[in-house]
Amino acid sequence: MFFTRSFFSLIPFKDTGQTDGYIATFGEDNDYLINAPSFTINDSDTVTDDNTLLMWQRQDDNTTRTWANAGTYCSSLSLGGHSDWRLPKAYDELQSIVDYGRLYNRINTTYFTNGTVSGYQYYRYWTSDIYAAPSNNLSFLIRFDSGSVEYTSTSNEYHVRCVRGPSTTRSFTDNGDSTVTDTKTGLVWQQSTSGSKKTWEVALGICEGLTLASQSDWRLPNIKELGSIVDTSEISPAIDETAFPNTISKSYWSSSPVSSTSASVTVHHLDFRAGRVLSESKSYDFWVRCVRGGQ
């Protein structure tokens, strides 16, 4: 059975950039390398992601804008000989250039300039995604100081980095064996939620030890993989419930710890009530959904 949802530019995820391990338990993000980040500088104005083939504005203009003005800015932009620029989607696009292996400034500044200025507004970049709550007037942004994905009032002013690339379609296939395949990324997902809420280390072990659909190479998804199944047009839960029925509108663990010099370990998790990426201590209890493939 096929479940197809159209989005403007679904693109394959790539590795998070996290190369450090924080605990002895196998299965955290750095234990798996998936599509290593790679970029090509086209000129002083643009850079192409070699994995997703999306072309990015290399240097933002260091100006903050409301969400509406951010969209107008991108659609009016002429850069690198192209005029089909737009505001990027949250999980499908802007999260793909977050480098979760870096401290504080989570973007590769070799390829993306203006990436070292500190300040509350500087690190927050608009996406085109609208929060699905009835009250609305809220849109998603990504914080490059933390890698978090949040929503805020569209009247706030934040930075903009425009993108260009083709439209694609997100498509899930129910394999009929309690698994779902994302035909765009090739990832195979556990269709249901595993058991009960667990601490992070226990969650890692559950996925590493899982045998499902005659396969035993399951793992806890990294934060970009987990983001690839978020549907920001939905709420409570923010996911395609036809493909993933009975998803709990709470947080699910990723395998990606927050890069830090602190002795305490915090980990990125995804709040499927609202579609947000947040972080919390590894000792918290969150839900678990395992994944395989993509390596």
Predicted region positions:
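Glycine-aromatic-enriched surface loops/turns that form tight recognition elements
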Residues: 1-86, 90-219, 223-295
